[in-house]
Amino acid sequence: FLSFVSNTRVSSKWAAVPWARVMAMVTPMRVRVEGRENIETGQSDVLVSNHQSQYDIFLLYGWLGVDFKWVMKQELRSVPGIGIACEALGHIFIDRSNHQAALATLESAKAKIVDGTSVIFFPEGTRSRDGKLKRFKKGAFRMALDLDLPILPITVTGTRDVLPAGTSDLLPGSAKLIIHPPVSVEGISAEACQRLMDETREVIASSLPAKLRSAG
């Protein structure tokens, strides 16, 4: 895993992606992907996904087919195995308790989002305990506006049934990854960030069951 540290794109393709697929296979978790045609080859995007389970990570890593950097909470850096692997892959840790430090980290991370490498956010900030789509935070949308990059909304379903909240029980099941058409930020001012965020949330919610679309 760490021998690929000098090239994080190669590391992701040849270590992280197979790892995610093997984890899904042994669960087992069947995966279906819709909307792959909405991914433009060579385009860097700000990827925005709902967050239902720890298994979202395997689903996105294993089946999205995009080179990306995660934006993740600083606390994960100290988790044995996970922290050092994510650092080797060039992922982005932010200190959510320090707003200015978080902004500075995102600012320095911009250099990584080039040449088809994207950045992915869970804008709810944490997993939804009840499956309902939570309110979004603005970080992903501010970065998209600042870098003038399209937002690629993604809906994840089924993973919370494979690994339910509050347990370590893995259950055989099915998951779906829905990739929506990109949302352009062209002509959108920073003052309209809230509207951009609300519109993106509506797109992601549209592929969830009606009972899970309201803020949990």
Model-inferred region functions:
Residues 103-216:
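Non-catalytic C-terminal accessory region of glycerolipid acyltransferases
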